[in-house]
């Protein structure tokens, strides 16, 4: 009986130690980058006085460019935005890089490892879209300053909440932006009694 108790304690200790390592393993897996398509992460200034930093995954073809650019905007997972993992849209990015495009996937303020704050305007979907579009504007401004980007050939795309933000972005003057792509744009918000189905 004494030996069985020691074995259970050892097993429990090993199990708890393994659980403690899991977040580190998840972060390590998340940070694995595909250098074959020059994947890297940058921080783009955004927000009031450019105090926030947008964690942005970049993919680009080999060579100095300039390359046409597609900016792909993410949706929102249920729960707190800072718990959402970094989006990569890897397969889409890979397809565009193979066709000579650079790709940026910015995580907007408050999402994943981006700093700043996520602003929730409740049921006012117009305000939600415009607020999220501000971070896309910051990404565009940063991109236009890069010598490896063709600032006259930019496409902005978005999926779900990123699609809503992309459509909101379209109300502004966007020099060099040739297309806006919306993939099932919108925001489902059950928490505020928004009645999103109506």
Task: Map each language-model feature to its residues.
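N-terminal cap/lid segment of alpha/beta-hydrolase-fold proteins
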Residues: 29-65
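Alpha/beta-hydrolase active-site loop
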Residues: 124-147
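The feature captures the conserved acid-bearing segment of alpha/beta-hydrolase catalytic domains
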Residues: 179, 184-198
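Alpha/beta-hydrolase fold nucleophile elbow
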Residues: 148-160
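Cap/lid segment of the alpha/beta-hydrolase catalytic domain
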Residues: 77-89, 95, 105-131
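Alpha/beta-hydrolase
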Residues: 73, 106-108, 183
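Short beta-strand element of the alpha/beta-hydrolase
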Residues: 66-75
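Short glycine-enriched nucleophile-adjacent loop
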Residues: 163-174
